């Protein structure tokens, strides 16, 4: 488990390389943090993204939602894309990927390896 707050991959433009929008700057910081922690992703991966709950939520709601599925934006595939792009320059060798989003007290990313035979 890596203590990194997940961030989706933004839709990039050529201009974002020199005049960064806030979402792009957040993504670049996320990418740097992934590399700093030395995250590795296997060819068959299960990525679990723990999305931090808003501070504005009551303690009751926080306790109720802890560990429950995260069903609002950002999309799981966008989070997985951001992770893959941060780790690999070419990620076509990943052939089996599962992405899960859950609510948590603080943000984190868990990387596991899928096992078992394909029928």
Language model features with spans:
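Catalytic phosphate/metal-binding cores of nucleic-acid and nucleotide-processing enzymes, i.e., regions
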Residues: 1-119
